[in-house]
Regions:
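Alpha-helix/helix-capping structural signal
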Residues: 79, 112-113, 176, 183
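General beta-strand structural signal in soluble alpha/beta enzymes
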Residues: 52-53, 75-77, 107-110, 169-172
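A short acidic, amphipathic alpha-helical/loop segment
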Residues: 11, 63-67, 96
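C-terminal and late-domain segments of enzyme folds
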Residues: 1-20, 25-46, 73, 121-123, ...
């Protein structure tokens, strides 16, 4: 949902393989902020899809599982990852999302909505230093978003990996996205020419960072996928 840059949004919609995919925004991490919901509709009502959202403050239905499973794509927004996961667990949304994933529904998101799918991630949900947070575990390894967008993300991820507090994994600059198929890393894509993804792991007492080839979705890059 980058303003005036729909490249990643279009990429997500294309993965559904249908003419007008049903995409549902889940704004739990922002406490269902209305402004955030409005931004989602502003972005996706312009595109070939059927947008909706799932509020847990004012649920659209009693049967949340059926509501989720009816969608082609779930798009989870950013905010407080720790609080989001706690609310999901209380309402069984975590289980419903896993069932959706097992049934072929595309799970996507940004920031908190990216961290949540992994075994663990780097979060600012707790005041103070960035810390490890356990995710849903649908994707193996750890994840760190905002790798270039926030000054303390890269050093904090390195610190946590080197100290053994978190396992190795994949980091992503703002504007970069990680595409997994059946739980296996498939490719990295980006909406910005300079945005990259990185493999980050501990080796012989040091943290090793390697750039993952990242396809820019603008210009000729769109023809490569």
């Amino acid at each position: 949902m980058e303003p005036d840059n729909p490249l990643l949004d279009l990429y997500i919609l294309r993965q559904a393989g249908t003419g007008r995919p049903k995409i549902c925004f889940v704004p739990t991490a922002s406490s269902d902020a209305q402004g955030y919901i409005d931004r989602f509709y502003d972005a996706f009502q312009r595109l070939e899809c059927t947008p909706s959202h799932l509020s847990l403050v004012q649920p659209p239905t009693v049967d949340l599982e059926d509501f989720i499973l009816d969608k082609d794509i779930i798009y989870v927004g950013g905010g407080n990852t720790k609080s989001m996961l706690a609310v999901w667990k209380e309402r069984s949304v975590d289980r419903y999302l896993k069932t959706a994933w097992e049934n072929g529904v595309i799970l996507s998101g940004l920031s908190a909505g990216s961290i949540c799918w992994f075994e663990e991630g780097v979060t600012d949900s707790i005041p103070g230093d960035l810390t490890r947070l356990e995710g849903l575990g649908l994707l193996s390894g750890s994840h760190c978003p905002h790798y270039d967008g926030e000054a303390d993300r890269r050093p904090s991820y390195h610190r946590l990996i080197q100290s053994g507090q978190i396992g190795g994994g994949i980091a992503a600059d703002d504007g970069a996205a990680l595409h997994y198929v059946d739980g296996v890393f498939h490719r990295a894509v980006s909406s910005r020419p300079e945005a990259k993804a990185y493999e980050v792991r501990a080796m012989e007492g040091h943290v090793v960072e390697a750039v993952i080839p990242t396809v820019y979705l603008g210009e000729a890059g769109r023809a490569m996928i």
